Amino acid sequence: FTATTARGDGQGLEKVFEEIVYAKTLPELIEQGYLVRLLGYRIGTSADLSRLSGEGLDFAEEELAEAVDIEERNALVARSIQELARDRRTIAFCVTVNHARHLCIALNALGVPAGLVHGTMKSEDRARALADFREGRTIVLTNVGVLTEGFDDPGVSCVAMARPTRNEGLYAQCVGRGTRLSPGKR
């Protein structure tokens, strides 16, 4: 069972499995009440992605970080999260650890309780950050790839894609973190 048919290596599932026995699309799952309806906002920034090179299915990480991890842009993303998400439990996907840290700082500067998780954290620090988020001590959690797959918190009701991507599979994985059903979710 998989929520997305796209693989990071660009291969389709038919390259891995002999037969796909059952398939449902995201719109079908939403229509049938298995996932919440999505409402998307695009926040325009001054980041110029037109000259970025690609690595496989996505932008080159270092170039992307240079283009988007800018104080002015992070402040705009933080204000947008504050205004649009309000009190919603939000996860924000960032390009690098520094980007996640800078966005977390920008959110906290606005009075939005935010934390961060990334793959190089000590496991006990990551567990504490996740517990703070689940228990409401922080309402925004910035991250770098850690919450993309295998993270299941139905209380997440807002996803902020602070890292542009050309990879549809990655985008679907990230957005999918906010589609789980949960009592009172709006």
PLM features per residue range, with description:
Residues 1-40:
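Post-DEXD/H (motif II) to motif III coupling segment of the RecA-like Helicase ATP-binding lobe
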Residues 1-5, 94-96, 144-146:
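A short beta-strand-to-loop transition that corresponds to the Sensor-1 phosphate-sensing loop
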Residues 17-19, 35-38, 110-113, 154-158, ...:
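Short glycine-/polar-rich loops that comprise or flank the Walker A/P-loop
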Residues 28-75, 108-113:
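Inter-lobe coupling/hinge segments of SF2-like helicase ATPases
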Residues 33, 140-159, 175-180:
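SF2 helicase motor core recognition
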Residues 63-110:
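Conserved strand-helix element at the start of the C-terminal RecA-like helicase core
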Residues 91, 100-108, 112-149:
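Conserved helicase ATPase core of P-loop NTP-dependent helicases/translocases
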Residues 164-173, 177-186:
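Conserved segment of the helicase C-terminal RecA-like domain
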